[in-house]
């Protein structure tokens, strides 16, 4: 049995005090003493060691002996179970330091997604002011995206309507994760994964139709950031919004044979931008992509027999193509529209959508591109050119494929998301403007305080001062010219 004087130095999370590490039982003997585990080489620094000693529950009984249920029954070092209550929430007096492997529950989250009852800076305030509710979380160890389920679907429709302690991205809430990787560090106050924009709405690769839900009933489903997780409310669209007619697309008489035509794969970051493209008949690529498409369009227009430029649209990581459009005008490099989800696209060009269908990659994977190392057309980068023969095959598949879903099914869903994004952009710009004005005012006041006050003088006083200075300079010059040289070793007479 270890000395009781040293028992009070036992840490409650990852390791033990370096001064008492020698008293830890060896793993080979399988003996567990007051420290409840075997020797752990993962030691905290002195600062964290001292921090863990503040407010910890005592391991000593009233008579000075070791409490059995607080000593011998402890789990392995770093994974204390005594602080958990029956509901899975984390009790008071325990501190979460260090990195927790995904096989173990992170202490600040309960098994049902609930948070600690005590005050802590890890209790994030959600934009909905509702927080997470116990019982809505996933308790199994699957990987869940911020919005999508394991199949890339929309978050509001996942089983359980929530994300549990073992959910995907839960590791990013661990306090020491950023010491391992800063890739997912909070930006502008938002915790997000990968391509979350500044407004907090993640880029969606597939809408609610992917799980068989139809948003045409007027339900306003907002796929939101980690701070909002889930908000569903019913709201009718404004009267000025007109729905697109599916009859305007996927026409059976669309030509599928061409002597000359150009085809390019377009990879979008989100379906939000696809929705905007169909709605406004416009598209914008990267700077290099715009140059490439503009050159191709100008070259096609010089052909006498006509040469259309077709664009095959797909959303990154969606596993499908969503439509086919035609480039009907050159790129305007000086025009930038403001309704894209991200404000980084410069220039745009008009397009006309011919097909709006969800075509799974499995229906197109057999088409390979010789100009792209014989890779399938589904494995293409943005503005990847598709030769005429392969492009015609793609058109035939778009015509013949009996798709049951398309992005038009989620039109109202994306209309509401667009409204939310625009409102947040407006608020963001307003806050940014107020911040700039406040900083400018602070800068002016700082300069005023730094400048030493000087006595004000009139114009006549300034002129008089300049005149006196001129006279002094003139007299000094005359004196220097009348001075006689002094001989060596001679003594000058005092004036």
Swiss-Prot record:
Q: Which keywords label this protein?
A: Cytoplasm, RNA-binding
Q: What's the domain of life for this entry?
A: Eukaryota
Q: In which tissues is it expressed?
A: Expressed in the shoot apex, at the sites of leaf formation, and in emerging leaves.
What is one GO cellular-component annotation here? Answer: cytoplasm
As for what it does, the entry says: Specifically recognizes and binds N6-methyladenosine (m6A)-containing RNAs, and regulates mRNA stability. M6A is a modification present at internal sites of mRNAs and some non-coding RNAs and plays a role in mRNA stability and processing. Required for the correct timing of leaf formation and normal leaf morphology. Required for proper trichome branching and morphology. Functions redundantly with ECT2.
What is its subcellular localisation? Cytoplasm
Q: Name one Pfam family in it.
A: YTH
Q: Which CDD domains match?
A: YTH (cd21134)
Q: Which residues form the YTH domain?
A: 261-398
> Which residues are involved in binding RNA?
267-269, 273, 283-284, 316, 340, 345, 353
Please identify the protein, giving its name as recorded.
YTH domain-containing protein ECT3
List the source organism: Arabidopsis thaliana
A GO MF label: mRNA binding
Gene3D superfamilies linked: ph1033 like domains
Q: What happens when the gene is disrupted?
A: Aberrant trichome branching with an increase in number of spikes. The double mutant plants ect2 and ect3 exhibit delayed timing of leaf formation and altered leaf morphology.
Q: Write down the InterPro entries for this protein, in alphabetical order.
A: YTH_domain (IPR007275), YTH_prot (IPR045168)
